[in-house]
Structures are given as C-alpha cells and as structure tokens.
Amino acid sequence: MYRRKRSSKSQKKPGKEWVSYFYIDATGKQISLGTDLDHARIKWAELEAKEKPKDLRLMKAIFDRYERDIIPKKGPRTQKDNLSEIRQLRPTFDTAPIDALTPTMIAQYRDARSAKVRANREIATLSHVFNMAREWGLTAKENPCQGVRKNKETPRDYYANDAVWSVVYRKATPELKDAMDLAYLTGQRPADVLVMRRDDIEGGFLVVQQNKTHKKLRIMLTTEGVDNSLGLLIKQMAARNAEHPSQYLIVSARGKRMSASMLRNRWDDARDLAKVEALAEGDTLLATRIGQFQFRDIRPKAASEIKDIEDASLLLGHTKGDITERVYRRVGAIAKPSK
C-alpha cells in the first residue's frame, strides 16, 4: 500500500493537501483504497487475504471511529447522550478485541452498573456500535448484546394535577407562563416548544417538526373558523412581544429567545416559591408534589387530559396509541361507584 499527496491549485483553498491510498496488484494495476487510513488498511487486508489489523479490531479504535463518523450525524441531544454512554463503556471495553465480546460480558456489565436505566442505554449504544463494526468489516460475529436481558424500567408516572399547576403558574414569570401554556396546548417536548416561531404559523396551523423523531405535525389554531385556545394564546403572545424583533414565540422580557437554561432557571424559581407558599400554609403533601413537578411533566399532563386516546397520540406525534397510553397517560380510568 502506498499513499499519494495532491495539492490544491484552487485560489479558494491554496496549499490544501489531499492524501489518497492505493494498492498495486500482481499485474501492476492501481486500486484506490480511499482517503481514510483506517479504511485503507482494512481494504488492504481484504485484498491481501490477511487478518484485519489488530489495533483496528480493538473496541477503542471502533469507539473512536463511531464517535468520528456516526455520532455527528445524529441530533444534538442524541450526540450528547451517545458520547456520555461511550465514555462510560470505555473503561470496561476499550482494550477488548471486538471478537472477544460475549453475551456473558454484556450481562456482567449490566449487573455491575448501579445506574440501572443508564446501563440499558449504554448497552443499546454498544449494540449499535457493534452493528456498525459488522458493516465496516471488522467482525463477522453475531451481536453479543442481542438476547441479553435489560434492566426493568418503570415509566415516570407523576401527574401534575390542577392544585400543583395553579400554584406554580401563579409564581411564574410572564415568559414562563407562556412556555407552560404553549407546552400544555401543543403537547410537545420542552426542546420543541422553545424553538417554535411566528413563521411556523401557516394557513391556520402551527407547524411542528419534532426534533427527537423528526415527526411533522400541523396543530390547528381554529375550530370551526373561530380561534381555539392555542390560536388565542399565540395571538396574545404576539401582541405582548410585538416590540421585539425575535421570531421565536417564547422570549424573555428583553426580547431574547428563551434558552433551555433560562427556562430551567425560571422554572426552578417558580417551583421553589410555590413550595414555600405551600409549606407556609401547612400543606406538606402539596409542597412535596410541587417539588416533584418537572417541566417535562406538562406533556403527559396534556396527554392525560385529552379524552380520546387517538387524539392524544396524534398530538404527541405517536404512531401507536399504546405508547401514549403506557407512558404518557398518567390518570386512571374513570369508574362508576358501586351505588
């Protein structure tokens, strides 16, 4: 295998160099191995009918390649989660050859982790890393994560009733109230609520593309030609923020787009004030419930308070009603008394 350098003659990129790798077969024919050295080494080994280089078959090199080539193509939150998961996996698996991984090793890792839910996420990421390594030709083994039992997970079942909602809402700043109302009426995730814009309003709909699933929704702003609750809210927000040039629906008092940290700070302040008020009135149970209330609980609150499960699933962007029912509906079924 040899490499060839080529310099750019472009005025836009003067002095830039490209490196390509080539294989010369028995007839003297040049076969391109690409521009990536690791890829070139693998192709060279295949052409020579030799074992793949050992260093490329260690999990450290495979994790490195996954971080370089795969993670950047994912959404921002998934990138952050995957990097954290791989960072946790590395001390255990970095020095292991990929072909040495077994279901028993994966199960032992699962059992050794004190954070049981995080262990499930880490093993899921490891499984995808292994599948990519198969595609890259670094192993022909079956995925060792397949068939390994996951730790049991209990979906969060907190429900913010009206008593909790009203006291936190009273303590909220105007922009936090807007965020709470918008999250409740649209049923969307906090990250999606914060990026809603005035120019997302098209033809009587608020157009939403969910960041997590890329699902597209058009949420109605009118019902039978009359503004519904969401339509009225957006008009009120637009009127209140008319002096600010920002296109975002939720902005601070100074007209700046509400960031996740700004939302978190305002939420913590309002919740703390609400908790103090409940304790001052001697209602420790309400204070505890207020302390457990997270902004993300607004989405399941919205789902729980829509009577029709199909309507709730549609608003949340779910393709299957059982996901909505199992994870997001947090109030019990209505039952009649015995008499």
What are these regions (language model features)?
Residues 200-203, 308-328:
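Short, polar N-cap/turn motifs at the start of nucleic acid-interacting alpha helices
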Residues 32, 68-132, 138, 257-262, ...:
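N-terminal core-binding DNA-recognition domain of tyrosine site-specific recombinases/integrases
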Residues 116, 120-122, 135, 139-140, ...:
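Basic, Lys/Arg- and aromatic-enriched nucleic-acid-binding interface segment
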Residues 101, 260, 280-307, 323:
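Short basic/aromatic active-site micro-motif
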Residues 32, 213-235, 245-269:
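C-terminal catalytic core of Y-nucleophile DNA break-rejoin enzymes
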Residues 164-167, 217-223, 229-235, 314, ...:
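DNA/chromatin major-groove-contacting recognition/catalytic segments
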Residues 13-104, 243:
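N-terminal DNA-binding module of tyrosine recombinases/phage integrases
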Residues 117, 177-181, 185, 191-192, ...:
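C-terminal catalytic core of tyrosine-transesterase DNA break-rejoin enzymes
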